Amino acid sequence: MKHITCIEDLRQVHKRKVPKAFFDYADRGSYSEDTLRANVDDLQAIKFRQRILVDVSKRDLSTTILGEPAAMPLILAPVGLTGMQYSDGEIHACRAAQAAGIPYTLSTMSICSIEDVAANVDKPFWFQLYVMKDRGFIKELIERAIAAKCSALVLTVDLQVIGQRHADIKNGMTVPPEWSLSKLLDFASKPAWVAGVLRGKRRTFGNLVGHLKGTDDITALGTWIATQFDTTLNWKDIEWIRSIWPGKLILKGVLDVEDAEEAAKTGAEALVVSNHGGRQLDGAPSSIEVLPEIVDEVGDKMEIMFDGGIRSGQDVMRALALGAKSCMIGRAYIHGLGAFGGPGVDKALDILRNELSVTMGLCGVNTIAEIDDHVLAI
């Protein structure tokens, strides 16, 4: 992987190795993708102050996330269908995160189940939860996460209604899926992916297996999921989840100051400033645009995490400078996974680690705690 020097390099390999439908599922956004682009562009528009003649020989990226030590201020975000990018992808990604000394978040919509991942890693991981109409099943998922010793619950709060993603529809990533000659030919042109994913033992929504009587087929489960996102979800439901989840609770998908104020009243330990990677409300502001005001409003009440548009270590530095305590990455590590499996995730994390370290040095800071808006040219 010597020729791989940035996340975009991993993205290009990912694009070549994985069928278009699954690559686009990870890479694209909703509607016109304005918010997806804004996440990236608004971060890159933020400029740094270059500082000179400062001793930066002892740079240290370590920090704490929710009171636990972390080797750097990164978290692998929950990504649905990770195991369709690379066979047993969730296990590979979790192992890479734990080797790097950072948290991994397993999606409700994963291919590998909570139990699959727990049986194949050495340390606790986080679990992401979608609240569905079937509250009994949600309680069961929480109980399974507790049994697996998951150390935090990430509750996604911005998916009561699913944003329309044009690329998914055009690629037949619908429920039920649409098959075409072009899709079959695309699959046939990716023999390594077919051998790993389609011939692997895990090819359905692992956390949902057994819930529908009589079938574990991914199409049937997908059809059920499409009917389960709950438009009645409200703050009282958060109270209920808080009452049955004994560990750290994180609310993911907050973009508005008023919502952040309500989030701070729930007893959650943290929130994630996020627009679901530009996959939900197209036309919403970028995550970095709203981060400072949310930090100002509730940063003294709960830990603020950032998600959306991170493609480099410089982007991590920008988010930290504007008040985030840590950053979630999704596409950045999924590109590594789709390109090279577990070693690709290792590579993505190595790239981000090195870029963050170099940027800290050029801005004259040695520790994560030193990073604030003084490193920015604003």
Model-found features: residue ranges?
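Glycine-rich active-site/cofactor-binding loop and its immediate structural neighborhood
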Residues: 70-109
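Alpha/beta catalytic cores of nucleotide-metabolism and tRNA/nucleoside-modifying enzymes
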Residues: 1-44, 289-378
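Active-site-adjacent beta-strand anchor residues
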Residues: 29, 107, 128, 155, ...
